[in-house]
UniProtKB/Swiss-Prot annotation:
This is N-acetyl-gamma-glutamyl-phosphate reductase. The lineage of its organism: Bacteria, Pseudomonadati, Bacteroidota, Flavobacteriia, Flavobacteriales. Signal peptide: none annotated. Pathway: Amino-acid biosynthesis; L-arginine biosynthesis; N(2)-acetyl-L-ornithine from L-glutamate: step 3/4. Its main location: cytoplasm. One of its GO terms (molecular function) is NADP+ binding. It is an enzyme of class 1 (oxidoreductase). It is found in: Cytoplasm. GO terms for biological process: L-arginine biosynthetic process. Its EC number is 1.2.1.38. Keywords: Amino-acid biosynthesis, Arginine biosynthesis, Cytoplasm, NADP, Oxidoreductase.
Length: 325
């Protein structure tokens, strides 16, 4: 059994991570740290865990050394400070953006690898430290990986994507609370969202270079969870050729599905799936992708990375069912 520690245990991604791991046959959760709620029963904060964990299980104030793997479910910019006090013998999967870009892969004696399984599955188990991708970055990259792999991305890419309120985490912000987001939609970080750095890095890795530009408009949605992304770019191939490229690329990826029908968020909420819909209009390839931002965009993908890291079945603990209605 792999012994697990979690830091940032009171947040939304930690909640989903705990729910996945308590049903994972290969792991044991040893410590869940929350600096905000030390000594408080975990089910007091994560009320959906009542009956799922022992009622006397408390948040800890610090991590213990008797673990094999540490999940860092904390905000951006804090991971390095925490890792200074963590033994190098403990493997790490980090949810923040601190180690996602090449220039940040090295920290002290740790070397991080970018944990997008559909991109780096063959090398993830060679690393002890994984930078979990951003949620928008995941939805967007899964839309274009097959094209970048054979160097087909040559033109500008235009993206619009909308995310649920849980994407911002448990923070006190007037633009993120219920009264603002309910029955509402708003843009933010137009053409300047930091997840695009991950996308550009991946395109350059696969194609060596990319001369086009990426125009990304992110939206805050009036719902709690999920991401739906639609992008388009010019591709000078037939639609049949494009579909064959996607089918071939994703044939061994258990969480990626292509749908000829229109797709919607309820198909993926509570799952580690990404569903893609392709359309081709006047040399423009239009790709819609849907994921659960808390699972495939965060905690589920982290467990998928863990499974690959430890040579478990990739889907272990992740055979989750969508909410549906």
């Amino acid at each position: 059994m792999i012994k697990i520690g979690i830091i940032g245990g009171a947040g939304y991604t930690a909640n989903e991570l705990i729910k996945i791991l308590i049903n994972h046959p290969k792991v044991e959760i040893k410590t869940i740290v929350s600096t905000t709620y030390p000594g408080i029963p975990i089910e007091y904060i994560h009320k959906d865990l009542i009956g799922e964990i022992k009622s006397n299980k408390l948040f800890s104030s610090e991590i213990t050394d008797d673990i094999d793997l540490l999940f860092l479910c904390i905000g951006h910019g804090h991971s390095k400070k925490i890792l200074k006090n963590i033994s190098y013998k403990i493997n790490v999967i980090d949810f923040s953006n601190d180690f996602r870009i090449n220039k940040n892969f090295f920290f002290k004696k740790r070397i991080f690898n970018y944990g997008l399984p559909e991109l780096n599955k063959n090398i993830i188990n060679k690393y002890n430290n994984i930078a979990n991708p951003g949620c928008f970055a995941t939805a967007i990259q899964l839309s274009i990986l097959p094209l970048a792999k054979i160097k087909l991305l040559k033109n500008n890419i235009h993206i619009s994507a909308i995310t649920g309120s849980t994407g911002a985490g448990r923070i006190n912000n007037s633009k993120l609370n219920f009264s603002f987001r309910n029955n509402n939609i708003s843009t933010y970080n137009l053409f300047n969202h930091n997840h695009i750095n991950e996308v550009i890095q991946t395109i350059n890795k696969l194609q060596n270079k990319y001369d086009g530009k990426i125009y990304f408009i992110p939206y805050r949605g009036g719902f709690s969870r999920g991401i739906i992304s639609t992008l388009y770019t010019r591709i000078d191939l037939s639609f049949e050729e494009i579909k064959n490229i996607y089918d071939k690329f994703y044939k061994n990826d258990p969480f990626i599905f292509l749908s000829e029908k229109e797709i919607h968020l309820k198909q993926v909420i509570n799952t580690n799936k990404c569903i893609l819909n392709l359309k081709y209009i006047k040399n423009k390839l239009i790709i819609t992708s849907i994921i659960d931002n808390l699972i495939k965009g965060a905690s589920g993908q982290a467990v998928q990375n863990m499974n690959i890291m430890y040579n478990f079945e990739e889907t272990c603990g992740l055979k989750l069912k969508p909410l549906g209605l």
